[in-house]
Structures are given as structure tokens and as C-alpha cells.
């Protein structure tokens, strides 16, 4: 399959009855209290060995933890992984002092946006994408306390024009998802449909291409680029607000443009914050974090002067894409691979969302690295792709995965 920007497709293949959503919905009252929203008990002691990551090197104490070699046999004798710390955590790795991020405890409000596009009647029609988001929305509702009224589903089988996954509706819904979000909220974004690449205009992608998603009306309205998704859904978030994203599409490896990327082999990519701090790119951010507006103005002016000399595309527009919020993204394969789709139990299903649900159903209490390995094991039974986890901040992969 070729990979110019309009023909790299990932999607599903198995019919699904086009019945309205309402029919199979029982009455949804308040979700029963479940362990996901419980903060740790007041006298909870974090197990030893979970301190903040050492500054300087990678995050893993004494090399990668055992799950990297041994699938899910979690070595270390802790009954379960530690919950996320409640205090701000320094970015480290050469970032300026005071430049921190915060994990979300995911105890606050929950909102979800799920987009599934089968492209009915178009060239490159898919069959599994609407199914993917129906499965995911049911899973979120039944297991993670996302109320139906706090979820927006955009699928191209709906009669209501506002629920069609057009470019305008998708962008509007992305703004809705993050509006008024607070620390410890848990926002969820799922996209199943065609993805692809387009030549990168601002010089910020390693491979010279931006990742894009294709709304149902892309032939008229055009695609949506990763930079725009980052600007709408990541930039406005406060420290400690979680956004979890899952992409079932081709070329989705960097679809939210997050700078830290992890695989079952360890860290694949991290930004050089010391270098970027030296270029003044983090100066504005850290001054802002300290509330030091005077220095922020002078730093910003110096940075703009430097950028105006047009040192190169990198100097001009590269921001670190780090965020003090808690943004994570699960995607299949690497950017250079295509996302496979196949029949699962007679229905076409997006590989990533299916593996994510399957892995968490088997064991809801996993660390990030355990979950990466579990998802890899699920994918390996049916697919060629490997999972990766991208993050807006350095991630302690031994912490308990919460959502």
C-alpha cells in the first residue's frame, strides 16, 4: 500500500447493524462507586523504590524493570503498583527549575469524545470503525464511570447532522471536550477511521510529515493535522488534568504530537529539554509557571527577536510540545507502519482499542509498563503491530495506570 497522504488507510472490516444507539441502552443512573475513583487511604505509604525518577538519565531505576524482559510477571514483590503522586513533579532532564507537571488522580469530572467513521459510500469505505467506538463507549460507561450524557459520539450512521463526524463537528467537539477541565478530571478521546500523513509545513516532525485524520467530509473540508489537535486538546489543559487518547488508524504514532514515547522496550523518544531551554523555548513557560511576568516578557521578546532572524524552521516554530497536564496516548505501530485491522469475533474491530479493553478487562490494576506489555501480548495474537504510549511529560512507567 502506498503512503502518499490520501491513500494510507487503516480501518475495519465486518458489518454491523445500523440500529440507533438508544435501543440497547438500559437506564443509566449514577455509576456505582468503584475503585477507580477512590484516592489512596489517608495513611497510604508508597512502596519503596518508587521515588521520583533520578534526574539526568532515563526514568528506570537500575535499567528497565523486569516486565520488559518477562512480559507481565511483575518482579519486585509489591502487591500492586503505587498510585500517582499528588504533588507536582519536575520535568528534569535539563528543564529549568520550577518547570513541573502533575499527574491526574482521575477522581474528578469525566467526559469522552469518540469518533468512528466508516465513510459509507466513499472510496476506501471501512466497516469496523463505528463498532470500535460503540464498544469503547460501553466499556467506559460500565467500567470507568463515564456517564452517557457526558460522552459525545460522532459516527457517520447517525441521522442528526450535528452527530456526523464532519471536520466542523469534530473540531467543535474537541473544544467541548477540554472546556472548563480541572485538575484530576479524566477526559477521553477515541478516533477510529482513516489516518495518514501529509508533508509537514512547520518543520516540527522528525520524518517531515504531519499525522492527519480524515473527517467524513475530508474531500471537501480537508483533513485535521496533529498540530491542530495538540493546540485544541493539549495546550489549554491545566496541570493535573488527564486526557487519554486512543487512535485506531494508520500513521497514528504521533497523532497528538506528544514528546515522550514509550514502548515495551523502554523509552523510544524524549525531547532534549536542556537544548531547548538554551534556545529560550522553555524560558517563557517556566517564567509563566513561576508567575514571573516581568522576566516572561523579556524572555519572550528575546526569543521572538532570535526567531525573527529565521535561524531555520526548527528555531522558528518548534515548541517542546511538553505540557504540565497529564496527557497520554495509546497507538498501534510506529509512525512508519500501517495500522492493521481484522476480524475479532466476527466483527471488524480497531486493533488498538480492542487490545486496550482486552488487557484491562483481564487485569484492571496494572502499571503503565505492565499494561503496555499486556496490550502487546493481546495484539500479538492477531496483529503485526506493536503498541506505543506517548506522553506530554516524562512518565514513571511503574506507577498504577488510572483513568
UniProtKB/Swiss-Prot annotation:
Residues 1-93 are annotated as: Disordered. Residues 18-31 have a biased composition (Low complexity). The lineage of its organism: Eukaryota, Fungi, Dikarya, Ascomycota, Pezizomycotina. It is an enzyme of class 3 (hydrolase). Residues 32-55 have a biased composition (Pro residues). Keywords: Apoptosis, Hydrolase, Protease, Thiol protease, Zymogen. The active site is at 194, 250. Involved in cell death (apoptosis). This is Metacaspase-1A. Pfam families: Peptidase_C14. One of its GO terms (cellular component) is cytoplasm.
Amino acid at each position: 500500500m502506498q503512503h502518499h497522504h490520501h491513500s494510507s488507510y487503516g480501518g475495519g472490516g465486518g458489518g454491523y447493524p445500523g440500529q440507533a444507539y438508544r435501543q440497547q441502552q438500559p437506564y443509566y443512573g449514577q455509576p456505582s462507586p468503584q475503585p477507580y475513583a477512590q484516592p489512596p487511604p489517608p495513611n497510604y505509604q508508597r512502596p519503596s523504590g518508587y521515588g521520583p525518577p533520578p534526574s539526568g538519565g532515563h526514568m528506570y531505576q537500575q535499567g528497565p524493570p523486569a516486565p520488559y524482559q518477562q512480559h507481565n510477571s511483575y518482579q519486585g514483590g509489591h502487591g500492586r503498583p503505587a498510585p500517582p503522586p499528588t504533588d507536582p513533579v519536575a520535568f528534569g532532564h535539563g528543564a529549568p527549575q520550577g518547570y513541573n507537571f502533575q499527574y491526574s488522580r482521575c477522581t474528578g469530572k469525566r467526559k469522552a469524545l469518540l469518533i468512528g467513521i466508516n465513510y459509507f459510500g466513499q472510496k476506501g469505505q471501512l466497516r469496523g470503525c463505528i463498532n470500535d467506538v460503540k464498544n469503547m463507549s460501553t466499556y467506559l460507561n460500565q467500567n470507568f464511570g463515564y456517564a452517557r450524557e457526558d460522552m459525545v459520539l460522532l459516527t457517520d450512521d447517525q441521522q442528526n447532522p450535528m452527530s456526523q463526524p464532519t471536520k466542523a463537528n469534530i473540531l467543535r467537539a474537541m473544544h467541548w471536550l477540554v472546556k472548563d477541565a480541572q485538575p484530576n478530571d479524566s477526559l477521553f478521546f477515541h478516533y477510529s477511521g482513516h489516518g495518514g500523513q501529509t508533508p509537514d509545513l512547520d518543520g516540527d516532525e522528525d520524518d517531515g510529515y504531519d499525522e492527519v485524520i480524515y473527517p467524513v467530509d475530508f474531500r471537501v473540508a480537508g483533513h485535521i493535522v496533529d498540530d491542530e489537535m495538540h493546540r485544541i486538546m493539549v495546550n489549554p489543559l491545566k496541570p493535573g488534568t488527564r486526557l487519554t487518547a486512543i487512535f485506531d488508524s494508520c500513521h497514528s504514532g504521533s497523532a497528538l504530537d506528544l514528546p515522550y514515547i514509550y514502548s515495551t522496550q523502554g523509552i523510544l523518544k524524549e525531547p532534549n529539554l536542556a537544548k531547548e531551554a538554551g534556545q529560550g523555548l522553555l524560558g517563557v513557560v517556566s517564567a509563566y509557571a513561576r508567575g514571573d511576568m516581568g522576566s516572561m516578557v523579556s524572555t519572550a521578546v528575546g526569543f521572538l527577536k532570535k526567531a525573527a532572524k529565521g535561524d531555520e524552521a526548527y528555531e522558528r516554530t518548534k515548541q517542546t510540545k511538553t505540557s504540565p497536564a497529564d496527557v497520554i496516548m495509546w497507538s498501534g505501530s510506529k509512525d512508519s507502519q500501517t495500522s492493521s485491522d481484522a476480524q475479532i469475533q466476527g466483527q471488524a474491530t480497531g486493533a488498538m482499542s480492542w487490545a486496550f479493553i482486552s488487557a484491562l478487562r483481564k487485569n484492571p490494576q496494572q502499571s503503565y509498563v505492565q499494561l503496555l506489555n499486556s496490550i502487546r501480548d493481546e495484539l500479538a495474537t492477531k496483529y503485526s503491530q506493536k503498541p506505543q504510549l506517548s506522553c506530554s511529560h516524562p512518565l514513571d512507567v511503574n506507577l498504577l495506570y488510572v483513568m
